[in-house]
Amino acid sequence: GATYVIQDCRELYDMKSAAGIPGRIGCLMEKIFTRHSDVVIAANAFRAKLMVKMFGLKKRPFNYENIRRLAYSSEERARQVEQECQEFFAEEKFRIISTAGCDMTRTTGKMIEAMKDLGEKYELLLIGDSEEEDEELAHRIIQYYGLTNVKILPRMDQDHLKYFIDHSQVGMVTYHQRDLNNKYCASGKIFEFLFEGKPVVTSTNPPLKEFCEKYGVGIADDDYAQAIKAVAEHYTKWQDAVHYFVNHVHVERNNHRLAQKIQNVLEEKQA
């Protein structure tokens, strides 16, 4: 039977941001490959539009949001995690959680600096793998401002991460905007927080800004301290908006819709 090529473009780099000759060759290969694929999938509508221009595509790629919902591996594991971690949350604080670790390209330095304006009622949890120099820099910023409201934690398994998000108040989703891949970042990270009932504060990258404005589930603002305060002040209102949104998102339907579109294209090609 016929063979079809379906390309899922998770990353998006152009010649300008490609690293050296190997990177440029990679970009060129991707351009050729993408133009000859039967179906192309982009991470969001912004990228789909951009790819038409970049790769000279006849059709706009399908866009597919990677919607991820955290779940406990078992009820017993959930109880274990609760026993291990409940002490960590004994003190009542307004907790902000980021799963970018100390990654400075994800504007973590700015996030830490924002904590000096928020004071002791707030706490920032940085969770995830970090480059050694990024972690050192994070510690230096914390030391410089004499902060006691920032905690750096290692990467966690899904059970622990779910518990930590569940017991925090706001999720941070931030990226730099110096290359296309980051500027037009996929907003999948947002869903991890929303499914736990938490509003988000994000950087102003176009997909994140549009998402926050369209669904009212958080604030996209480059002044992180101001945005966090704004969410904290009307926290119940933001939570209600998140619950409304989550009740109207259907992961399986989202997946099925894309599968149906792909099937239609391939059937047309067979005809």
Where are these regions (language model features)?
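Helix-loop-beta element that forms the nucleotide-linked donor phosphate-binding surface
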Residues: 48-70, 75-79
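Nucleotide-activated donor-binding/catalytic signature segment of Leloir-type glycosyltransferases, i.e.
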Residues: 128, 135-163
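A short alpha->beta transition loop at the rim of the catalytic pocket in nucleotide-sugar-dependent
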Residues: 169, 195-198
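Conserved donor-binding/catalytic core segment of Leloir-type glycosyltransferases
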Residues: 41, 81-106, 111-115, 125
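Active-site proximal beta-strand in glycosyltransferases
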Residues: 1-15
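A charged, aromatic-enriched C-terminal amphipathic alpha-helix characteristic of glycosyltransferases
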Residues: 79, 83, 222-228, 233-270
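Membrane-proximal helix-turn-helix segments that form the acceptor-binding/catalytic region
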Residues: 4-7, 21-43, 53-54
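Nucleotide-sugar-dependent
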Residues: 105-106, 157-164, 171-191, 201-210
